[in-house]
Structure formats: structure tokens, C-alpha cells
């Protein structure tokens, strides 16, 4: 150790300077790499993962009044530009590169991106129209997307909403195509170029049986762009794609556990033009895919009609529930049991009834079954309930009914609104809450009840799989509300402690959407969507479909100042107000203010850092690297020149010297020997080197500037004594409230308590504002530090005061010019 100390003394200040420069360089490299990792990845994510959501216009709406993003792609603009220049479009947001193919690994062979005219002669968008034969699977595991695409071909109005028909490889061809998908409540236009991945000149992924037909391959590429890459499409549910094609809500039923009113459900779905399908689960123990009854295992059938058919026999007269299905193969592979094409049962059906249902006996893959045989021979039925805007005017005029729909967007923010399921009672009530009001029962419902479908969908998870983000485990619960309970916004802990749910999602499950159907009497109901565990971050939309009108609203607080009724949350003691002694306060102010008898933010910071040093993180400042950082080693004497260098060397080289003899010589294995001291040891004393990352020196300059601005009426940047006195009184109140909610005395409060703490300070905030505060001021574990809590209170008070000043009519409306708004807010 003596040799090492001698070396360090000889190096002296030269070593410290070199080490300081090296440390600064290393720090810059580390910080730079972190910034690059965060922001460059974020930029790539913005451009590649969700290009169409961010950059495409919502169909039927104007673009944002804030002006377009630089990456906005407008189909007509790009098309006309390419036609004018004679060039073919190359999409910079979804380039012909490996990143658009896969995110987990590089392709195992050379992939060549070719345009259709380089793949086939006389390329066509459609060849003799479109059909399910145009949908053939390639090497990508996206059969769920193909099944949905095949179903889409059965409905022309839905098909051409997704796939605009005016596109071709002849007239106005410029290598650009566009497709439309529903994404989380909005229709987005996705633009692509027509370069497609090939191997040995053949399309690798979705393709048509006709080599020169390309609508299906281009549709798949647009869907891949929507989700960031082709690989993002591996594995999924047909329901997911059907929703993206229609904007509907999908539900499915296990026919072995079918509800007693399933036939009525199917009937009403058919009346609303819902898309329906069914299937038989494949049996690994059975080699033949075809059953003795002519049905195909593991194969999707379309349900094309659900009705009651009149039947007249010598022994019976009445109606029989029937279902018509179609095998998409369109061949002789049909049901051969009762009510099949050659079945004798049809002779008991009146001729006018046969004509009414359009009965034919062609070998076209279409056949009829009784509902009971349907339950006996199929395993699963899926229903895609179409949104109200999916029905054409002609369909509505022809008697097709539509669903009534309400929708809200929401967010789970860790420590704020991510409360987890009912198992976590203390935080469950912090989840977003929604009220639906059902007024009229369903028509023809003998029990006077309302059919309600609740669908909870998490947003953007598939598109973020390249960042290791999978679906959260989600679900929801439904509670009835009486008139008195309606007054509570939101419902608090005690409501859920003593109230039982009247409905809930069948499971908490890690799929994009969880959906359930309920029969509820008219009334008011509270829906609480949540993740299974608390503190899981995500965005969602919640939709409610009903046969009669439903009114939906967010059950949340109104933003503003509270009234006299605001109290500390039950169970917490009321804080004692701190009344500073005016004489002592005046002396303190006079000693700091100087000749102008005003304090600026720096002088305010000195006062607050001194008076509230026990409530703030311990000071850490950096000698040579920023302001003044000194290392101290207990083994070194006061005059030992090597002490600071030892500490510095330990900090810089520690990670590289672990497990070597130098670790013991430098004392790196004894954490108690390494300390950092601030400018003023009395402000908090030594702290360990490991605390550097988490600690700051007193109130930040931004907090102090904002506190001055809050009361600085003349915008001088300074406070007089009366303003200073008012500010300290506000801070004393906020400090007292903070201590009440800092139950563990850690200098931090849980984000879940932020609403109650701010309510106690007199501020009412809703979930949207609380989420923003959580993102802005919360730590990774959802905690809020004391100075950040003060900043929250300062900002909220300032902005409310700015707004209230202009809300002269007290109708929650204020008018500012852009200049006025910037002037008022930028100083705050």
C-alpha cells in the first residue's frame, strides 16, 4: 500500500487532472451511449414501429392543427409527386431491408426485394376479381391473418374499405399503394411501396394462386408496416385481424360449454351483419382430417345464415333452428348428415320457405345443419360484431340492425393509475373508472334486460415486440351504482371493500383484447379495467356495445381548486400548520435580500436549502467535474495528498479491478471507507459513493424559479417580503401534507397517494393530469420525492391561477392568444 501511495503522491495534481479529464470523457461516453440508446431507439421506434398510427391521417378527418410531422405520408401527394418526376416510390419509413423483415435475428439467407413487374409478367392488382383463393400462406407464421383476409373477401363493402379498388399496375402506376386498417378507435391509411421480399425470384410470404396477382401480398406488407416488421405478425388470433379490418368487437364461445341463449346470440349477430365463423379442433390422435360426416378438422367455416325454418310433418308442425355454413374450399367437402343437400328432411319444408332462404343443392361447399347438430359437431364459434359505421345505408334500409357503441381511451401509469386487480384492494380503486347508463331494455327481451358487450383492448403491444414487450394480463370488473354512489368521483377504497361485482371478464389473460357479454337490468354501472398486477404500464381502449343506447362517461374528478369539504384521507392525522415567526422571518429575509429588499431564485434556494435540509436528499457536488467534489478515505490523514486520488481511482477503476490484488490495496471492498462530502458537511454529512446517482443538492433551480414565478406578479424575477411570506406559508402547508403521507419517513410518497395528498392541499385532479405528473415527476418505482412534490403543487397552482384569471364567466373556459399563452406559461 505504501508503494501505491508513493506512486500516487508522485503523480500528484497531474494525475488528478488526467484522471478528471478521463472521468469526464468516460462519463460523456457513458451518458452519450445512454442517450443514444434511448433516443435513437426511440426515433427508430417512432419511424418503424408505429409509422401509420403516428403519421397517417385518420380517415375522414383533417390532420392535426399543430401541423404535420415531418414523416407524414399522404397518398395523393406522394403519388402525384412520383408521377410528375417519373420515379417509383421508395418508402423511407419501411425500407427494403432486413430491419423490416425481422427484429430478433438476421435472415439466414439473402433476401431480394423486387417489384411485381420484376417477379411476373403483366402484374395485376386483381385477376378476375378477388376471392379466398387469392390468399395463400408463405413462410411466415401468420395463418391468423390469412384466415381473416379470406373472410374479408366475403363482404365486398368491408373489403373495399380496407383495400381501395382504384389501384393498379397500369394507370397512374408509381410503385405506391395504400391500405386502411382500424387501429384503436381510428381508421388509418398505411402507405407502402411495392417492393416485396423474394427468394430465388419467388414471393416468400402471402401470395395468390395466380402468380401475377399481388393485392394479397401488398396487403400483408401494409399490415407488417403497421406493426413494425413482418416478424411482428408471427402468431396471433383471427379475431385480432378481423377487428383491424372492420373496427368490430370479437367474441368467441366454446360450444361444449355454450350458453343457453347462444342461438339467439347468433340470430341477433346475423341481423347486425356480424361476421361469424366456426371450427373443429384438430385431434393429434386422428390421422384423417375429415370426419365421417364430411367435416374438416382444424378448418374454418363461415356462417352465412341463422334462422328459424318452418317445418310440416305428419306428426309435427313448427319451427326448427337452423344454421347455414360454407366451406371456403368451395367444393364437395360438405356435411353429409341430416339437412345436407341430399337429405330427405327437406321434403317437409314448404316451397315458399325454400325460396325465401335461397335453398340450393349445388356442390359449392355450402350446406345447412340443425343447431343441435352444430353444437354436437363443432367446437368453437367466433363472432365479429361490426361497429355502427360498418353497415352501409342500403344494409340499414334492408332491415339490418346496428349496435350502439361507446368508447374511451385510457392509461395505466405505475404508481398512479396502475392499481392491479381486485386482489390488491388498497390500490385497485386507483385504476381508471367508467360509468355506463343503460336506459331501455332490449326489444323483445321478456325479462326487460339489456345486452351489453364490454371489450378491453391494450394498445400497441404487438408493434413493440421488437423491444421485448408482450401483452399484459388484463381484465375488468363491473359494479352496480345507486344514485348516492353516483356522486362519488371516483369511487374510493371503501366502495370496493364492501361492494361485490355484478359481472367481470371471464379471465385475466395476456391477449390483446378481453371481451365478455352480459345481460343487465337498466341502471348505472361502474366498469374498472385493470392489469392483473399493480404497477404495470400500458395504454388501452374500452368499448361498450349494446342493443339499445348506452351513455358512457369517465368517473373521475374535475380539475380545479377544492372546497372546504376537502379533508385528509381517513386514517391519516391532520397536519399541524407551521406558522413561521414573523420577526425571525423578517430578519432572515433582510439578511438575504440585500439593498433591493427582494430575493431572486438563487437567494430563495439558499433559504430553502438551509431551512429544509432535513427534508431534502443529501447534497452531492462534484469537484473538478462540476462544482466541488471531494473524496475522503478514513485511513488517510488530513494532509495526505493521495487520499482524494485513492477515492477517485477507486471510483473510476473499481469495476475493472474487482477480484484483483489492487481491490484490497485500494480498500474498494470496504464501502465504509469511501465517502463523498459536500460544500457544507453540516448540511448532511458524508454519503457513500453509491448514492451519487440518486441524490441532488437541495431544491433544483427549476423548482426555485417556478416558486418565484408563482407569486411574481410584475415578472421581475424577484419577490418582496409579503410575497416571500406567502410563499413560505404555502411551502409550510405542502411540507406538512407531505409528511402526513410519507408514512415510512423516506422523503418520498407513493404515487398512488398523490391524488389524496394534492386533494389535501386543495387541488382536484383527474387521472389524465395525474398520469402526466407521474410520468414527469415519478421515479421508476412510482415514488415522488419531496422537492418533486413541491414542484407539482407549484405548477398546478400556477396553471390554475393563470386559467382562472381569464375564466371570468366561471364556465371553465378561458381565451388566450398564442402570444399570451406562451408569455404566461413559459415564465411559470
From Swiss-Prot:
Pfam families: Calpain_III, Peptidase_C2. It is found in: Cytoplasm. GO terms for cellular component: actin cytoskeleton; cytoplasm; endoplasmic reticulum; Golgi apparatus; neuronal cell body. The active site is at residues 143, 299, 327. It is an enzyme of class 3 (hydrolase). Gene3D superfamilies: 2.60.120.380, Cysteine proteinases (3.90.70.10), EF-hand (1.10.238.10). Activated by millimolar concentrations of calcium, and by phosphatidylinositol 4,5-diphosphate, phosphatidylinositol 4-monophosphate, phosphatidylinositol and phosphatidic acid. Signal peptide: none annotated. Its main location: cytoplasm. Its EC number is 3.4.22.-. Keywords: Autocatalytic cleavage, Calcium, Cytoplasm, Hydrolase, Metal-binding, Protease, Repeat, Thiol protease. The keyword Nucleus does not apply. GO terms for molecular function: calcium ion binding; calcium-dependent cysteine-type endopeptidase activity. SMART domains: calpain_III, CysPc, EFh. Disulfide bonds: none annotated. Residues 1-14, 579-614, 699-734, 729-764, 764-799 form the EF-hand domain. Coiled coil: none annotated. InterPro entries: C2_III (IPR033883), Calpain_cysteine_protease (IPR022684), Calpain_domain_III (IPR022682), Calpain_III (IPR022683), Calpain_III_sf (IPR036213), EF-hand-dom_pair (IPR011992), EF_Hand_1_Ca_BS (IPR018247), EF_hand_dom (IPR002048). This is Calpain-A. It comes from Drosophila melanogaster (Fruit fly). The lineage of its organism: Eukaryota, Metazoa, Ecdysozoa, Arthropoda, Hexapoda.
Amino acid at each position: 500500500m505504501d508503494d501505491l501511495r508513493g506512486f500516487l503522491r508522485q503523480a500528484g495534481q497531474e494525475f488528478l487532472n488526467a484522471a478528471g479529464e478521463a472521468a469526464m470523457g468516460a462519463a460523456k461516453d457513458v451518458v452519450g451511449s445512454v442517450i443514444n440508446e434511448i433516443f435513437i431507439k426511440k426515433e427508430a421506434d417512432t419511424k418503424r414501429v408505429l409509422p401509420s398510427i403516428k403519421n397517417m391521417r385518420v380517415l375522414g378527418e383533417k390532420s392535426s392543427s399543430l401541423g404535420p410531422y415531418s414523416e407524414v405520408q399522404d397518398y395523393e401527394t406522394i403519388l402525384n409527386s412520383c408521377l410528375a418526376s417519373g420515379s417509383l416510390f421508395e418508402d423511407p419509413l419501411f425500407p427494403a431491408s432486413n430491419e423490416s423483415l425481422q427484429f430478433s435475428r438476421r435472415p439466414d439467407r439473402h433476401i431480394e426485394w423486387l417489384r411485381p413487374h420484376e417477379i411476373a409478367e403483366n402484374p395485376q392488382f386483381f385477376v378476375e376479381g378477388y376471392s379466398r383463393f387469392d390468399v395463400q400462406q408463405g413462410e411466415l407464421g401468420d395463418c391468423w391473418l390469412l384466415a381473416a383476409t379470406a373472410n374479408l373477401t366475403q363482404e365486398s363493402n368491408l373489403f373495399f374499405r380496407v383495400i381501395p379498388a382504384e389501384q393498379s399496375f397500369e394507370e397512374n402506376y408509381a410503385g405506391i399503394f395504400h391500405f386502411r386498417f382500424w387501429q384503436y378507435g381510428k381508421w388509418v391509411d398505411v402507405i407502402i411501396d411495392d417492393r416485396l421480399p423474394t427468394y430465388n425470384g419467388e414471393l416468400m410470404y402471402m401470395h395468390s394462386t395466380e402468380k401475377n396477382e399481388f393485392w394479397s401480398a401488398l396487403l400483408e406488407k401494409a399490415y407488417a408496416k403497421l406493426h413494425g416488421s413482418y416478424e411482428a405478425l408471427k402468431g396471433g388470433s383471427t379475431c385480432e385481424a378481423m377487428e383491424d379490418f372492420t373496427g368490430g368487437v370479437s367474441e368467441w364461445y366454446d360450444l361444449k360449454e355454450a350458453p343457453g341463449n347462444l342461438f339467439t346470440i347468433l340470430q341477433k349477430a346475423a341481423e347486425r351483419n356480424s361476421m361469424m365463423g366456426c371450427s373443429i379442433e384438430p385431434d393429434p390422435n386422428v390421422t384423417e382430417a375429415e370426419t365421417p360426416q364430411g367435416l374438416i378438422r382444424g378448418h374454418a367455416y363461415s356462417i352465412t345464415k341463422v334462422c328459424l325454418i318452418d317445418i310440416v310433418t305428419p306428426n309435427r308442425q313448427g319451427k326448427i333452428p337452423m344454421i347455414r355454413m360454407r366451406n371456403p374450399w368451395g367444393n364437395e367437402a360438405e356435411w353429409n348428415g341430416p339437412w345436407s343437400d341430399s337429405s330427405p328432411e327437406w321434403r317437409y319444408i314448404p316451397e315458399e320457405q325454400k325460396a325465401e332462404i335461397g335453398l340450393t343443392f349445388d356442390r359449392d361447399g355450402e350446406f345447412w345443419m340443425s343447431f343441435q347438430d352444430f353444437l354436437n359437431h363443432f367446437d368453437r364459434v367466433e363472432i365479429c360484431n361490426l361497429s355502427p359505421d360498418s353497415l352501409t345505408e342500403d344494409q340499414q334500409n334492408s332491415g339490418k340492425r346496428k349496435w350502439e357503441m361507446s368508447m374511451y381511451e385510457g392509461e395505466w401509469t405505475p404508481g398512479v393509475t396502475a392499481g392491479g386487480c381486485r386482489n390488491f384492494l388498497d390500490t385497485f380503486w386507483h385504476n381508471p373508472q367508467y360509468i355506463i347508463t343503460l336506459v331501455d331494455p332490449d326489444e323483445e327481451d321478456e325479462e326487460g334486460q339489456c345486452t351489453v358487450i364490454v371489450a378491453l383492448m391494450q394498445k400497441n403491444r404487438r408493434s413493440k415486440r421488437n423491444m421485448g414487450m408482450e401483452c399484459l394480463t388484463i381484465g375488468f370488473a363491473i359494479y352496480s351504482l345507486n344514485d348516492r354512489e353516483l356522486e362519488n368521483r371516483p369511487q374510493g377504497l371503501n366502495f370496493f371493500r364492501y361492494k361485490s361485482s355484478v359481472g367481470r371478464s371471464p379471465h385475466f389473460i395476456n391477449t390483446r383484447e378481453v371481451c365478455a357479454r352480459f345481460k343487465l337490468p337498466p341502471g348505472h354501472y361502474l366498469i374498472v379495467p385493470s392489469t392483473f398486477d399493480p404497477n404495470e404500464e400500458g395504454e388501452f381502449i374500452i368499448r361498450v356495445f349494446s342493443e339499445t343506447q348506452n351513455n358512457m362517461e369517465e368517473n373521475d374528478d374535475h380539475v380545479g381548486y377544492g372546497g372546504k369539504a376537502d379533508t385528509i384521507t381517513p386514517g391519516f392525522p391532520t397536519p399541524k400548520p407551521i406558522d413561521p415567526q414573523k420577526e425571525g422571518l423578517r430578519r432572515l429575509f433582510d439578511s438575504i435580500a440585500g439593498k433591493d429588499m427582494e430575493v431572486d431564485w438563487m437567494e430563495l434556494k439558499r433559504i430553502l436549502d438551509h431551512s429544509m435540509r432535513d427534508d431534502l436528499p443529501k447534497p452531492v457536488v462534484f469537484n473538478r467535474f462540476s462544482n466541488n467534489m471531494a473524496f475522503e478515505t478514513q485511513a488517510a490523514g488530513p494532509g495526505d495528498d493521495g487520499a482524494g486520488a485513492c477515492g477517485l481511482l477507486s471510483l473510476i477503476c473499481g469495476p475493472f479491478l474487482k477480484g484483483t490484488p489492487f481491490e484490497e490495496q485500494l480498500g474498494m471492498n470496504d464501502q465504509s471507507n469511501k465517502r463523498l462530502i459536500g460544500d457544507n458537511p453540516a448540511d448532511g454529512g458524508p454519503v457513500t459513493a453509491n448514492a451519487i446517482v440518486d441524490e441532488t443538492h437541495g431544491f433544483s433551480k427549476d423548482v426555485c424559479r417556478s416558486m418565484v414565478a408563482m407569486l411574481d406578479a410584475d415578472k421581475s424575477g424577484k419577490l418582496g417580503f409579503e410575497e416571500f411570506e406567502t410563499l413560505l406559508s404555502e411551502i409550510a402547508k405542502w411540507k406538512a401534507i407531505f409528511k402526513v403521507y410519507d408514512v415510512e419517513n423516506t422523503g418520498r410518497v407513493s404515487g398512488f397517494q398523490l391524488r389524496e395528498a394534492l386533494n389535501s392541499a386543495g387541488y382536484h385532479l383527474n387521472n389524465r393530469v395525474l398520469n402526466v405528473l407521474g410520468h414527469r415527476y415519478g421515479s421508476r418505482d412510482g415514488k415522488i420525492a419531496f422537492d418533486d412534490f413541491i414542484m407539482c403543487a407549484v405548477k398546478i397552482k400556477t396553471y390554475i391561477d393563470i386559467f382562472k384569471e381569464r375564466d371570468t364567466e366561471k364556465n371553465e373556459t378561458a381565451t388566450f392568444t398564442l402570444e399570451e399563452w406562451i408569455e404566461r406559461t413559459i415564465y411559470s
